[in-house]
Regions:
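Acidic, Ser/Thr- and Gly-enriched intrinsically disordered low-complexity segments
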Residues: 1-175
Length: 175
């Protein structure tokens, strides 16, 4: 039996920065807003009807919840000595959402990471990969050791579709 595919959020800017789900999310909330502008139609000087005009589409968003549980392993995700701790995963997500080089003069380096969310192989009928940025992170710490070590945490991550190539083209044109 093949191994279960795990959801991964990886930085497109730093190949060593990624978070793989310890437990896959129970659900993914994918949404996209479509803008419609309302216009009153006047008939004989009376606003009689409302017409709508397509105004464009907002980027797709994805919300998911990840559970990191090290309760049985003193805060580590597995019994392996080199295993990540719960807080390592939380910090990695926060790092992907943080500005990479705050003092840099280059605006492309003075921004948070572009990310890629994947779950399974490209050839499957699963959720398509999403190039995105992290829009929000909410961490709920659920269990602690006597010394304060975080043993379990639930992290809700909000992501917004972003195409770095298209953004780079717009940036070059606007200079």
């Amino acid at each position: 039996m093949p191994a279960t595919a795990k959801l991964t959020i990886a930085s497109k800017d730093d190949v060593n920065l990624q978070v793989t789900a310890q437990y896959n999310p129970r659900e993914l909330l994918v949404s996209q807003t479509i803008d419609w502008h309302e216009h009153q139609i006047l008939k004989k000087d009376v606003a009689d009807e409302v017409d709508v005009e397509f105004g464009g589409m907002k980027p797709e968003t994805l919300q998911l919840e990840l559970l990191f549980d090290g309760f049985e392993n003193q805060g580590r995700l597995t019994r392996d000595v080199g295993s990540f701790a719960v807080m390592n995963q939380v910090q990695a997500l926060k790092e992907m959402a943080s500005v990479r080089f705050p003092g840099d003069r280059d605006p492309d380096r003075r921004r948070p990471h572009y990310c890629l969310v994947v779950w399974g192989d490209k050839g499957t009928l699963g959720v398509p990969p999403l190039r995105c940025v992290i829009e929000s992170i909410a961490v709920k710490y659920l269990a602690f050791a006597d010394d304060g070590t975080v043993l379990r945490a639930s992290v809700t991550v909000g992501l917004k579709a972003a195409d770095p190539v298209a953004i780079a083209r717009r940036t070059v044109r606007s200079r």
